[in-house]
Amino acid sequence: RGVVPRFSDLDVIALSLTAEHLGIDSENNLFDRLKEYQKDFRHIISRRQFNDRRKNTYQLCEMIRKRIAKAMDGAEEYFCVDSKPIEVCRLSRGKRCKMGKNEPDKSPAFGYCATQGVYYYGYKLHAVCGLRGVIHSFDLTAANVHDIHYMKDVKFEFSECSILADRAYLSAELQQDLFSSAHIKLEVPYRLNMKTWKPAFKPYAKARKRIETCFSQLCDHLMLIRNYAKQTTGLFARITAKISTFTVLQYINYINDRPLGHVKYALN
């Protein structure tokens, strides 16, 4: 294994999450600030080493995040699913963007966001959260991947539960597949022009807004849509750090018997 570094992987993750909570999304800015606290960080690594090790430890960070989420919300039977556009550059610069050129299977793409009515170049963040707002699973796909394709992977992580979704996930074939393979009941509102139209169940419609609130908090407090990454691995690591920070702040509220959604005031 080689020499064990004094600045451990957990230290790298902790520093990354702390920077995200403080709104420091520039590594140069972070290490300029750390110069004032050299006595407290005797084994601090260089900025380049931190950048490399944060990319190498984002899977460990996600594994820890899932365990924390399960500790808070492990017995949940109802979940919400939705997607959020992640723009990597302006639409006019999409063809010149070099992100993912060496990894075609992970490269961004042109896509359309129906809720905002805009075209963009980048990725799409898919997430599944419980009714209390705890994100249990998420993934990044190219912007041109339909939301339904993400649901085909959900059946390997969830079972015997109900998932509330919007009309983008409406598919009789998908609903049947999820129920037959993992006993997942996908609740999707009907379209107005459908012959079998039925009014939406109001409690489900209200509960489905929970994940929209999570996305709003991630964008507001943790600046989810701000991106300075040059490569796909760096972007994935940053997204993982932001969502992990969100989960840790919820956990701090959880152990202090405070509302999980008050993430801005978790450390007050």
Predicted regions and their residues:
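Short alpha-helical elements
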Residues: R1-N268
